[in-house]
Amino acid sequence: MGSEALAYALRLLARKGYSRAALRAKLAARFGEAEAEAALGRLEAMGYLDDRAYARAFVETRARRYGPRKLRALLLARGVPEEVVEEVLPEARVEEALAVLRRYRHREDKARAVRFLEGRGFPLGVALEAWRLAQEEGEGYK
């Protein structure tokens, strides 16, 4: 009872990280609700399933490309509980937005650059400040 679900879950987790909700959906579709919950309980007890660790790793791997709003949306879409998301997300920093902006091809166009940063999840104020700093640094921004 549940050993097939547990083995399947371990195979999935060996390939990539999953949030509890995402793994629960996969297991429930294949084995049913009761077996899925039993397997998830065992995985959590063994330390193989942890939403906080998953969210931290997710943010670490994507923080260079996305701002906090985008990361928040991605984590919530993957079923990470909101309290965990709020705990692991960093505050939007102008330095991070500036680093992203430096890699952007159309950085000389203010409107495009700010829209780009907003699309990456940076708040408008942070995007504007990053653009202003880049302009002051004299990196060819207009």
Swiss-Prot record:
It is found in: Cytoplasm. GO terms for biological process: regulation of DNA repair. Keywords: Cytoplasm. InterPro entries: RecX_HTH_1st, RecX_HTH_2nd, Regulatory_RecX, WH-like_DNA-bd_sf. Transmembrane segments: none annotated. One of its GO terms (cellular component) is cytoplasm. Disulfide bonds: none annotated. It comes from the Bacteria. NCBIfam families: PRK00117.5-5. Belongs to the RecX family. Modulates RecA activity. This is Regulatory protein RecX. The gene is recX.
